[in-house]
Amino acid sequence: AFAGILADADITAALAACKAEGTFTHGVFFTKIGLKGKSAADIKKVFGIIDQDKSDFVEEDELKLFLQNFSAGARALTDAETATFLKAGDSDGDGKIGVDEFAAMVKG
């Protein structure tokens, strides 16, 4: 799904770095996966993949399964990790992350 945007080796390394529960940090993940240096168009493509229900927002349930977008066998985020991730990205307080909020969080 991320072919042409993210390198498989970067995805593998990023997932390995947060394999244990409680170790996911979005900033570290976005850096390791190589997303920070990508164009706005590529970041928008990644957002579109993560937005499973195509609502133009990433909601809490989609964030919980965030890592599984990159590898089907990846773990779900813990409730605490999900809450921290949502709080970091939800700048307008509506309980979900839009594409502009996601891009701002990636560029962090």
Swiss-Prot record:
Listed GO MF terms: calcium ion binding
Domain EF-hand: 38-73, 77-108
Entry keyword set: Acetylation, Allergen, Calcium, Metal-binding, Muscle protein, Repeat
Statement: the UniProt record of this protein carries the keyword Chloroplast: no
Alphabetical list of Gene3D superfamilies matching this protein: EF-hand (1.10.238.10)
Binding site for Ca(2+) 1: D51, D53, S55, F57, E59, E62
Binding positions (Ca(2+) 2): D90, D92, D94, K96, E101
One Gene Ontology term, aspect cellular component: cytoplasm
InterPro entries named in the record: EF-hand-dom_pair, EF_Hand_1_Ca_BS, EF_hand_dom, Parvalbumin
N-acetylalanine modified-residue sites: A1
Disulphide bridges, residue numbers: none
A Pfam family of this chain: EF-hand_7
Function in brief: In muscle, parvalbumin is thought to be involved in relaxation after contraction. It binds two calcium ions.
PANTHER family given in the database record: PARVALBUMIN (PTHR11653:SF12), PARVALBUMIN ALPHA (PTHR11653)
Further facts: Is regarded as an important allergen. On the 2D-gel the determined pI of this protein is: 4.51, its MW is: 11.25 kDa.
Similarity comment: family membership: Belongs to the parvalbumin family.
Protein's UniProt name: Parvalbumin beta 1
Organism, as annotated: Merluccius australis australis (Austral hake)
